[in-house]
Design a protein with these regions (language model features):
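N-terminal interaction/assembly modules
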Residues: 1-132, 136-151
């Protein structure tokens, strides 16, 4: 499984967190099994390969982090979505941005450009071109402001 596929699965799981009552650990335990991937692979090629240990660890780290920092990430999204209330942003778009912002803030081993570019590419699969531009603009502003040297 590629890092991009693992990231897209993390986005899907972050999206699922938006409307499930399951604890994040329970959700991950149920979704990251070979059996779960095998059953989903019939309908979705993204699940053709179950994640190995490294990719499974990455997915868990991201999804658990997004869950733990959801309020902070949502506040960042709303702060950079000038003129938009968070509640108006599509759930898929917010999941994409949460994952990218979590990577930028808490995973220094991932280059910011890789996090943003991958997020935009994932968004292109699920959102309209206008929403993709919106996501790209928010993430670009976020990275410039949040990673700028502080004086």
């Amino acid at each position: 499984m590629t890092r991009d596929n693992a990231r897209e699965i993390a986005v899907r799981l972050a999206y699922e967190l938006s409307f499930t009552d399951k604890p994040v650990g329970e959700l991950l335990d149920g979704r990251l099994t070979k059996e779960a991937f095998a059953s989903l692979a019939e309908e979705d090629p993204l699940y053709a390969d179950a994640p190995g240990a490294k990719q499974s660890e990455y997915i868990r780290r991201v999804v658990e982090g997004v869950s733990a920092h959801a309020a902070e990430l949502d506040a960042d999204i709303e702060r950079y979505a000038v003129g938009w209330k968070f509640s108006r942003i599509p759930l898929t778009a917010s999941a994409v941005m949460r994952v990218a912002m979590y990577e930028v803030l808490y995973m220094p081993e991932i280059p910011n450009a890789a996090a943003v570019n991958s997020a935009v590419n994932i968004a292109k699969k699920y959102e309209t071109p206008e929403t993709v531009r919106f996501i790209n603009g928010i993430l670009g502003s976020f990275v410039r402001q949040e990673t700028a040297p502080r004086s």
